[in-house]
Every structure is written in C-alpha cells, then in structure tokens.
Amino acid sequence: MTHLERSRHQQYPYHMVLPSPWPMLLSFALLSLTLSLGLTMHGYIGNMNLVYLALLVVTLTSVFWFRDVIAEATYLGDHTIAVRKGINLGFLLFVLSEVLIFAGLFWAYFHSAMSPDIVLGASWPPVGIQAVQPTELPLLNTIILLSSGATITYSHHALICRNRNKALSGLFITIWLIIIFVTCQYIEYTNAAFTISDGVYGSVFYAGTGLHFLHMVMLAVMLIICYWRMRTYQFTSTHHVGFETTILYCHVLDIIWLFLYIVFYWWGV
C-alpha cells in the first residue's frame, strides 16, 4: 500500500513503523562487538579478526537502517510534525544519557585526583606520569572544535535563510575541522608518554578523552551524511531534523570537550 493510500485511512499523525530486521540485527552485532572486544583485550582471543568482523556488521546494519529512515522521511512523507517532535525528544534523551556517562567519568577523575592514594605517590598526576601539556595539541584542538561549532551554526542559519551555497560551504568547512580534530587527537595519543594501562590516571584519562574521540568520529560520519543529503536537496529551510539533531550533537560535544580540557588537561596537571 502506497503512502497516499495509507493516508486516506490513517486518522492520526504518527508513523506506524513497518516490521524491520535492523533493530534485532544491530542488537546482536553490538553484543558480538562487545564480547569480542572484551575477550580480545583480556587475551582470550589472539587477534582482532572477530572485532573487525563485528564492527563491519554494525556499520552495514546501521547504513541500511539509516537508508530506510531517510527514505521514510524524504520520499514517503512519514515524518510529520508529530513524528519530528518525537524524534527530537528521543534525541534529547540520548544526549542526556551521554552527559550522564561523562558525568560518571568526571566523578571518577575527581575521586582519584582530589585524594590521591599513597600508591600513586600521594600526588596527581601520579609519580612517573608525564602528563600532556595543556598549551600544546589540546589547546589547538580546543580552538578547532570551537571553530567547528561556529561554522556549523553559520551553515544552519544559511539553510534557514535558503542560502544553499553558504550552507554547503559552512558544512564542508565543519567536516574538515572535525577531521583535523580527530587527526590531532590521534597524534596526541600516539605520542603520549603513558598508556591506558598506566594506573588510574591512564585509565580515566583515556576513558574520558577516548570516549569523546569515538563520539567525534561518529559526528564526522553524521556530518558527511548531512552534507550528502543537503547536496541532493533532501533538506529544506523548514524540514531538516537530521541536520538539527547533528548540530545539537556537535554543540554538546563542544561543551563536553571544554570540560575535558579544563579538568583533564589544565586543572589535572
């Protein structure tokens, strides 16, 4: 039954989702990824092949699922105003869960830093740890990330004002700024004088900044998808929920990075 035929009989503005295999497949893929990663890190599996396979399945499943969602929103017209409100509310709850995760990591950092154990030399950073200096790559990354927040806001306002070229330009610059940030963060990790196994400092540092790093990689993918959708005229000045949620995600990660920089790189050193 086509969308026009369904609209004649549907007396409510909500989208009744058809049966889909992607939620179940993604759940099993994420379970496989978690188990394989844990077993590999603890030495029960001698290589990363299962991790790469599970990651590939997660990626492909996500691509096919997002393809269906984009088709429902763009070509079938299933995303009404009521549906868009529900999507925005759901994404806000997702952002809240992310904030709570980072709040737990900050709690762990303060718990260890404000009362360092005698095993750590009664000092923070612990004795023998050469911390990353806040005036080096972290400061550059902060400037880059704040700049990306400005450019994506510029792109959003240009889209609302129906200036497609400026919107595309701002989004293109944002993508490259995020890629540069991720690259600089990777360089910082490869040149750091400590690892995730160097006590509580290394564990909390890499857990906090590493989780943010993974979110930035995911943000880069989301921005690339938004750029492709904008180029193919799938966004209008009044209907661009995917772009709005990506912008919100970008600003939340900017704020989290500011707290990470102040606490992990500046105050903690």
From Swiss-Prot:
It holds the Pfam family COX3. Its EC number is 7.1.1.9. It catalyses: 4 Fe(II)-[cytochrome c] + O2 + 8 H(+)(in) = 4 Fe(III)-[cytochrome c] + 2 H2O + 4 H(+)(out). It is an enzyme of class 7 (translocase). One of its GO terms (biological process) is mitochondrial electron transport, cytochrome c to oxygen. It is found in: Mitochondrion inner membrane. The chain crosses the membrane at residues 21-41, 45-65, 90-110, 138-160, 167-187, 205-225, 247-267. It comes from the Eukaryota. Keywords: Membrane, Mitochondrion, Mitochondrion inner membrane, Translocase, Transmembrane, Transmembrane helix. SUPFAM superfamilies: Cytochrome c oxidase subunit III-like. Component of the cytochrome c oxidase (complex IV, CIV), a multisubunit enzyme composed of a catalytic core of 3 subunits and several supernumerary subunits. The complex exists as a monomer or a dimer and forms supercomplexes (SCs) in the inner mitochondrial membrane with ubiquinol-cytochrome c oxidoreductase (cytochrome b-c1 complex, complex III, CIII). Belongs to the cytochrome c oxidase subunit 3 family. This is Cytochrome c oxidase subunit 3. It comes from Candida glabrata (strain ATCC 2001 / BCRC 20586 / JCM 3761 / NBRC 0622 / NRRL Y-65 / CBS 138) (Yeast). The gene is COX3.
